[in-house]
Amino acid sequence: MERVVVSMQDPDQGVKMRSQRLLITVIPHAVAGRDLVEWLVQKFCILEDEALHLGTLLAQHGYIYPLRESRDLTLRPDETPYRFQTPYFWTSTMWPAAELDYAIYLAKKNIQKQGALVDYEKEHYALLHKKINHAWDLVLMQAREQLRAAKQRRKGDRMVISCQEQTYWLVNKPPPGAPNILEQGPERGSYNPSHMQMSSDFYKCEIECFRKALGRNRVKSSACLEAYLKFSSQHGPHDPIMSGCLPSNPWITDDVTYWAMNAPNVAAPTKLRVERWSFSFRELLDDPVGRAHFMDFLQKEFSAENLSFWEACEELRFGGQAQVPTLVDSVYQQFLAPGAARWINIDSRTMERTLEGLRQPHRYVLDAAQLHIYMLMKKDSYPRFLKSDIYKGLLEEAVIPLETKRWPFPFLRKPLHSSPSPALQSTPREPAATSSPEGADGE
């Protein structure tokens, strides 16, 4: 996070900074929330939502803070002004948040606002007053001295220092219900069960969850082990570590024949590859060659529009954000509109839900229709494809690579020697050397 913040403040390639006027006070080196989001999008090539989430994490960790509504540590993609926190208050510096410092901070706020603290700050103030009562005169003296020194600064500097201190204590002493990033970390959510009210409704929900858990069907260990054995026996021949590679392992022999025979769009697939199509419908769709042969089968059965619709939905789901409206309109005109050339057959409820979502198109608007068509092909077309002559012919015509030299476990292979070991050489027999008169004549 610190590297990101330092890059943001780069004078050449960082975020554009400007002076921000708050009423009659001018705050220098301020940045707009919109500029922060745009910089993160361009820097890391991410979506706007992801950039907004990353910026919010930076704010929650105290690396940036808002000049307006300073208690709200979230990033807004608008003209809301923000400033970068000084490195002295960064969480990585591990500056200990001592109780004495927190008491001085609360005492300053109490003097400035004449006792108008937030509820949880009042509780902390009273608790600290009891805990360090022996040094409370020192706390008040330090608070008044810091306020006296602050009056010598410009109003803009006083506002900046006040926001910096408030952001630091919001991170180190968060309000009740807010995420404590120093304990939970950025990967956890803002859910904090310690602040939940243990009411009767809470216990009713707990009892209902336990009842559902008791009524849930449990799978026996014998059934699980049987499923594991079936899966292992089915996938064992296809595991290159356990069964080796045919014709050879390219990482050992430097022979790329294995990669060439298993290319994504090879003309003649191997037998192991064709056999994997029968494992599951997802295996068939994930293989470009298998999907092409499945499309040929569906064309013969006059239902190729189902697979075409599924492919169009996949393109919409993983395509660019700028092309979403165009792709949604194209899919609707081709597959869903009344009298469409490749109209698909889905139930009325799914059609109503899909048409309602098309009013505000997004990349997941066709998920319900895509799932319906997927299950239709999985339960109807896929079993008939495995029993068809097309699949049987592919199995018969599939390529079976010839084994050159296979090492299922390369780490068990013995090292090669340039010359045989002397211990393995047999001593020459004397009769064989002297029995031939021709040999004697030759010498």
Curated annotation (Swiss-Prot):
CDD domains: DEP_RGS7-like, GGL. Residues 280-395 form the RGS domain. Residues 198-259 form the G protein gamma domain. Residues 418-437 have a biased composition (Polar residues). Residues 418-443 are annotated as: Disordered. It comes from the Eukaryota. GO terms for molecular function: GTPase activator activity. Gene3D superfamilies: 1.10.1240.60, Regulator of G-protein Signalling 4, domain 2 (1.10.167.10), Transducin (heterotrimeric G protein), gamma chain (4.10.260.10), Winged helix-like DNA-binding domain superfamily/Winged helix DNA-binding domain (1.10.10.10). Keywords: Signal transduction inhibitor. The keyword Disulfide bond does not apply. Pfam families: DEP, G-gamma, RGS, RGS_DHEX. SUPFAM superfamilies: Regulator of G-protein signaling, RGS, Transducin (heterotrimeric G protein), gamma chain, Winged helix' DNA-binding domain. SMART domains: DEP, G_gamma, GGL, RGS. Residues 11-86 form the DEP domain. Inhibits signal transduction by increasing the GTPase activity of G protein alpha subunits thereby driving them into their inactive GDP-bound form. PANTHER family: LP21163P, REGULATOR OF G-PROTEIN SIGNALING 11. This is Regulator of G-protein signaling 11. The lineage of its organism: Eukaryota, Metazoa, Chordata, Craniata, Vertebrata.
